[in-house]
Amino acid sequence: MLLSVMCVAVSLLLLPSQVAASTVTLRVSQLQGNLTAALRERAAHLGPADHLVLYFDRAGTFTIEGTVEFACNVEIKGLGVKKTTVVLDNGTDRAGFKAFFDDTFFKVSASTSQPLAVSIHDLSVKLKDHNGIWWDGAEKYAFKLCNCAPVSIERFNCTLRNAVCTNVDLRACSNVTVRNCTLTNYNNCTTGGVLWLRGQMHDIDISANTFYKYGNDECVAFFGADAPVPGDIKRYNIKVANNDFYYVNRGNGPADLVNGVFFTYYVGTSTPATVGCASSNVDISGNRFYMQGLCHTIMGITFSERDTHDNVVIANNYIENSPVAGDQKIRHCDYEVTDLNAARIPITFSGNTTVNNAAFVAPWGASGYCHLMVHGGAIVDLGKSSLTDNVATSSLTTQRLGCRLLSFDNAGGTVNMTGNSFSGLGMLASIDYGDGIDGKVTINADSNVFTGDTRIYCRNVKTVDLNFVGNTFNSTTSNFFLQEFAQQGSLVFDGNMVNTPGNGQLMTHWDNNDKAARRFNKLQVRNNVFTGVDGERTLLQPITNVRSRSVAGNVYR
């Protein structure tokens, strides 16, 4: 035993090239002097073949005042999150000791050819309490790991407040496990997130954690192409499951601070145009999002022209939007999906639940709440999900609120809906974007329940194909389905149950354009039960330009 200790002590005094690979256990209780300086000195003698165990082996609070960088495999551990606390301090220059001058406190930097293993567990880390916003305009990180594998972060608490700083930044790291952690970032400013993963990666498991965020920037983000890899970036076997996410004002900032995008999966506009990302087996499931502050988009999924994807599933998640005090108008979207790749592989949303208790009012006074926004011609399969919007009025507007279930940008897109239940609707779909929609919009709906204002609004759109079969419409208005139509398109409306207050029409025509300009290449309305519709003539009254028509077997009550 004595010989083993002596060998370790000797190895710390030699350069890595002078000794064989070693395992070094560094007990913080045995270090003297400034902790940051001592850790730097010990780490400087270890290389990629070595393994360092940094053990905070006594209960208490320890301070790190500068960057500690490891070029070896490292395990950082304590006695438990309630017994071991590491405080990150901005530091000051004194006696030749450099304070925090880099962009991160703990850094592990490896290469793609020789990744390093990292384990962090059983301790708490927090930024020192302070006034004002630290590092405004110069983003920092508590932990930055580059080209590391495997990475295990478990039973770990990390809290940052009032700083442009991100808790954990993983760059081109694989075989990553983040589990049973509580990660908090109340940056109270424009920049800084909680857990960011960049570049090429595989076998990622982020499960059973609790995330707290307030301020702009993503809580959890997959993005970037930071690893110099040949060809396209590859990401596969990504799982984010059974986590609790809170967007809540518990910092010192204003209550009306807006978060842009809370959770994202993308590559990013800074990636070279010649580089794409091949994603497969991406599972975002069983998570709970409690949104207690202003946020533009809760979850954004984005694929560029060169990106490919397969088996991307967002399932069994729960979203709850809570009321927000104040009088700020805002546009809010639960999910935004962008897919610019021509392959058009569907992205699956299944079994998700959304409950809205917030009054989202757009700057122009209408409802500012959208459930799913489709960009770039994406295809979305939306099944077995539910939405309940409980807010119909607000002191900020005289207009009635309600959720806009679907929206599309100028490239159009396809949404396939099966077995869903949506209530409190302000509009079933808005097919209206800027100067017009050039791409084709397709909505296929089977066995859904739509409750509220169930209109599909079309404006300046070239082509729309609608296929609604076996659905239930509990409409609060007589305009229960179409408000205007595309320049051309088709409508199949079969086997639906429609309940309206009276004088129901399949399409209403309110704008100044000639209604004959709306061309139904195919109009099929069969075997529906209409309550509150006087008959076929009233039902189809504004529809005059039909190429192929089949209307039969309908019941009017």
Indicate where each model-derived feature is located.
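Parallel beta-helix/beta-solenoid
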Residues: E75-K82, K98-R161, T177-C181, S207, ...
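Bacterial N-terminal signal peptides
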Residues: S4-L14
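Extracellular/surface-exposed low-complexity segments
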Residues: V525-F530, V546-R557
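Boundary at the C-terminal end of the N-terminal hydrophobic targeting segment
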Residues: V19-S22
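N-terminal extracellular ligand-recognition/capping segment immediately after the signal peptide
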Residues: S29-R40, P48-E75, L79-D93, V125
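Extracellular beta-strand/beta-solenoid scaffold signature
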Residues: T36-R40, E65-T67, N90-S111, N131-L145, ...
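Extracellular beta-strand solenoid repeats
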Residues: Y55, T63, E69, E75-K77, ...
